[in-house]
Amino acid sequence: MLNKLKIGTLLLLTLTACSPNSVHSVTSNPQPASAPVQQSATQATFQQTLANLEQQYQARIGVYVWDTETGHSLSYRADERFAYASTFKALLAGAVLQSLPEKDLNRTISYSQKDLVSYSPETQKYVGKGMTIAQLCEAAVRFSDNSATNLLLKELGGVEQYQRILRQLGDNVTHTNRLEPDLNQAKPNDIRDTSTPKQMAMNLNAYLLGNTLTESQKTILWNWLDNNATGNPLIRAATPTSWKVYDKSGAGKYGVRNDIAVVRIPNRKPIVMAIMSTQFTEEAKFNNKLVEDAAKQVFHTLQLN
């Protein structure tokens, strides 16, 4: 299994530096610049630790981190594809805020029992009554409600239109193809509903820290992510209580377990990060501790814990 991954040649660690405001995407969102890999004992230790985690959990792990305080980025399989699962719901909420007038957030969307799919803890409460677009966004982000997600995609014009919005954001990597819950099938070598850790982190950065949304829109998205009810055992579990983690988790078949986040630390600029993982059998159960351990190693490498 893992021997097929050719760990020694595939696991890449890059640590780059730039001015956070010196490089811009098509939407003028600051991003880290590319730089040659710098060999160091720290990088070698990080690489070996992540390789050990992959062996320990029998999984493939991808990590991308941008420290906006220093401009440094840290990556490990950051350009490999993973099923994004429910992490995209944070970006979907950003796309809704970007695409619709703010007054539309209070517009009620009606739906019936036939519109419900598996795992819809909030939308099932309001069948026949409907929910506002803001309520649907909060249900999708905070509770990972699948029916809310599908209703929002429909409101935007479907998965094709959502992908066009990502392309306008500067994302030429992510493939959006299916609705919930089918997008969580996560079959190996299937590029449908996949992205890379780097792209997921940069999209989250664009919506929360970039210029894509207005300040009032960003405040709304921050609040939805701050109240996320599904992320406690993931990146948040690797942080002290004084830090704030604004995240969206995801899970799927083949043991997929992901978390994307902006981490706010007192007296410094935030960290943008994505941790994605997958296993090798369809029935594999995801492991929260894998994500927590990967996050701990990130913070240790950045000398933050």
Curated annotation (Swiss-Prot):
Span of the signal peptide: 1-33
EC number: 3.5.2.6
Source taxon at top rank: Bacteria
UniProt binding sites for substrate: 248-250
Pfam annotation, one family: Beta-lactamase2
InterPro entries named in the record: Beta-lactam/transpept-like (IPR012338), Beta-lactam_cat (IPR045155), Beta-lactam_class-A (IPR000871), Beta-lactam_class-A_AS (IPR023650)
UniProt enzyme class: hydrolase
Gene3D superfamilies linked: DD-peptidase/beta-lactamase superfamily (3.40.710.10)
Claim: NAD is one of the keywords in the record: no
Miscellaneous notes: The class A beta-lactamase family has a specific amino-acid numbering system, sometimes called Ambler or ABL numbering and often misspelt as Amber. A multiple sequence alignment was used to derive a consensus sequence and then the consensus was numbered taking into account insertions and deletions. This allows use of identical numbers, e.g. for active site residues, despite differences in protein length. UniProt always uses natural numbering of residues, hence there appear to be differences in numbering between this entry and some papers.
Protein name according to UniProt: Beta-lactamase ROB-1
Upper classification of the organism: Bacteria, Pseudomonadati, Pseudomonadota, Gammaproteobacteria, Pasteurellales
